Structures are given as structure tokens and as C-alpha cells.
């Protein structure tokens, strides 16, 4: 049976999951004739959850009466991230998706049936007007439930679906769902989804609205950098990245000699081995994680980072040039994520195996001491970045939910 992370009166907030045998509470504020119910299906990784939360915020900004329900699984980051953002979360059985068609895909119907039933119960409980899916473990059951599968004893009810694909190479759940979705949106062209409209990746409002120039002095003071510093920002995701840590920390002496300040988020499980700072060296600020990314972006002139969809979206949205180091596993999607920015001139790609202290020192010093080239890369990154992706997805969802004939019962 599905679980729920319930909310207090007023339609938002979260408490502990209810017992599995408890009755489902009403989700969001009380339904009314003029309030729309939107179910956001995106769980598992931050790359699925964060765009969903950005769209939730955009929906509420467009229509404060909208009722938001996030659909997730017990194993995903949504169990922490969704309640933190103040939205209601319903949990269903996780259905891991195979990367490629084959035997696992052939056995998928037996695995997914329970999750589809649970998803359908959620859609009925909240009287859903539209499902917005972001891929991942929870998306396919939501798409199938919204399609109106004839699961007795209830009548079929089709709910419109909007799909957003954040990666350059669409995952299996979104490839399946796109065949019958009402609208298909993607981060980049050529994602593998037909009819896809390119909107970028939804990012948090604090990032989308960031004016780096206005916030720069405050941001640099926050981290202890001089106003006129040349600042390199390094991060490898929520857990850091060992290869980035080694390469950049190994280049610390050369970076200091070039007058480069460093803000380095190395990950809570990692430890940096740094040389003792010499008198007169620019600051090298090493932290386990950054909880104010807007300040980090505002302080920086250049970034070294991975190339996950959310990372590329945020870095390009704020107009930061970057050295992208794709994760050297998977099917190469991280490199594909970075290519639109790189091809536009807003960054470069360096293979993980090629990232050495010598390369870091040479490339970073070369860029940060060449104002004309850095300015050109900054402008290119800003041109290709998408600041209003969350708003575009939210507007598409509301349009589909209110469209004539969008919702039918047979």
C-alpha cells in the first residue's frame, strides 16, 4: 500500500509517514471548483527531484490556489527534499527502470502493476487534473495510471500528462511516456523524444533570478575573498568528486602563484590534502558542502564541476563559464549534457582521466588572466542558459490541465 507524508491544514508542510494501513488523508487544500490539482512525478535522485520542486514553486507563483502533490518512492531523496520545501509527498513502490530494452523490460509489467495501482489511488485521492513527470523510478507508474488503465473496480479516467526530460539522452520511463503525453518538454534538442519542446532544465528561483554582478561584493565578503579577486569555484555534486578534489588541490601552489582564489566544496565524506598556505597567498576556502549556491555562483568567475543536467542548467543559467568534467560512468549522458554550452562557447569539456593538477593550473590561470576570453565565455554561457524553464513547464501544465477535452472519463 502507498504511504503518505501528510501535511497540516493550509495545504503545505510535512510530518512523518503515516502507517501503511491508515486511510489516505486529503492532500493539499480542500478541493474547490477553481483550484487545480497537480501531481509531480519525479523521484530518486536530485536530478529528478530538484526540477520538480522548481516547477512546484513556479506553479504556486502562477496560481496560489493550486494544490501540489509530489509522488515519490521510499528509497529516493524526495523523502527529505520534498518536505524540506514544504510540499505534500505520497510514496509508492519503487520500480527500477532498465537502461535498455530487453529481458528486464519484458518482465516490467509484473513489477510495475502494483506501483500503477498505488499511483492511480493517489491520483484519485487528490482528484488530479494533470501529471507532470520528470523521469526516474516513479514516473512510469504515474504515466500509466494517468493514461487510464482499466484497473477494476473503478472506471477508466484519463488524466493529461506533461513530460520533462532533463538529460540529453532520454531515460526509458520518459521514452515510454512520451508516446501518449499531451506535452513533451526537454532540456536540449535531440533528446530522443519526438515532439519535444526545448525549454531547458527548471532551476530554483534563487538561481534563476540571480544577478551575479549585484550580489558579487556580498558573496565575496561572505567567503573572505577580496572584491577584485579572481575566483575559481569547484564542486562535484552533493558528495563531491575525488578526481576533481585531487586535481584542484594538487594545483593549489600554481593557482596561488597566478593570484587565483579558490572556493572548493569537496564533499562531506572527503578530506582535502592541502599545502600550508604561504604568507600573501590568495585564500583557498575548502568546505564540505555549499548551502548557499547563489552566493557561490555570485562570488565565482569560473567553475570546475561535473556535467549532470542540474549542474549544467544552473551554471549556464547564471552565466558562468565552466570546465565540465563528465562523470566517467554510465552511458555518456553527462558529456552530452554539457555539449550545447560548450558548442556555444560557454565552457569546455575535459575527460575525467585527463584532469591533472598541471591541466588545472594551465587552463584556470590561462582563462582567469585573459579578461577578453573570459568575458566571451561568460556571455556565451548566459545566452545558452535557460532561466525561465520552471515557468515554462508550469505554464504548460496549467494549460494542459485547463484545456478543452484534456480530461475524459469512459
From Swiss-Prot:
InterPro entries assigned to the protein according to its UniProt record, in alphabetical order:
GlcNAc_MurG, Glyco_trans_28_C, GlycoTrans_28_N
**What's an example GO BP annotation here?**
cell division
Could you name the Gene Ontology cellular component terms for this entry? Answer: plasma membrane
Reaction(s) this enzyme catalyzes, per UniProt: di-trans,octa-cis-undecaprenyl diphospho-N-acetyl-alpha-D-muramoyl-L-alanyl-D-glutamyl-meso-2,6-diaminopimeloyl-D-alanyl-D-alanine + UDP-N-acetyl-alpha-D-glucosamine = di-trans,octa-cis-undecaprenyl diphospho-[N-acetyl-alpha-D-glucosaminyl-(1->4)]-N-acetyl-alpha-D-muramoyl-L-alanyl-D-glutamyl-meso-2,6-diaminopimeloyl-D-alanyl-D-alanine + UDP + H(+)
- Per the UniProt record, one Pfam family is Glyco_tran_28_C
What topology does it adopt in the membrane? Peripheral membrane protein
Q: Where in the cell is it found?
A: Cell membrane
Q: Which UniProt keywords apply?
A: Cell cycle, Cell division, Cell membrane, Cell shape, Cell wall biogenesis/degradation, Glycosyltransferase, Membrane, Peptidoglycan synthesis, Transferase
Record-listed E.C. numbers: 2.4.1.227
| Source domain of life | Bacteria
Record pathway: Cell wall biogenesis; peptidoglycan biosynthesis
Predominant place of localization = membrane
Q: Where is this region: Disordered?
A: 1-34
Any GO MF annotation of the entry: UDP-N-acetyl-D-glucosamine:N-acetylmuramoyl-L-alanyl-D-glutamyl-meso-2,6-diaminopimelyl-D-alanyl-D-alanine-diphosphoundecaprenol 4-beta-N-acetylglucosaminlytransferase activity
* Ranges annotated as biased composition (Low complexity): 14-34
Q: Which Gene3D superfamilies match?
A: Glycogen Phosphorylase B
Enzyme group, top EC level? transferase
Q: Which residues bind UDP-N-acetyl-alpha-D-glucosamine?
A: 45-47, 167, 204, 238, 334
Q: Give the protein family.
A: Belongs to the glycosyltransferase 28 family. MurG subfamily.
- So what does this one do? Cell wall formation. Catalyzes the transfer of a GlcNAc subunit on undecaprenyl-pyrophosphoryl-MurNAc-pentapeptide (lipid intermediate I) to form undecaprenyl-pyrophosphoryl-MurNAc-(pentapeptide)GlcNAc (lipid intermediate II).
Protein's recorded name? UDP-N-acetylglucosamine--N-acetylmuramyl-(pentapeptide) pyrophosphoryl-undecaprenol N-acetylglucosamine transferase
Q: Which organism is it from?
A: Mycobacterium bovis (strain ATCC BAA-935 / AF2122/97)
Gene name in the database record:
murG
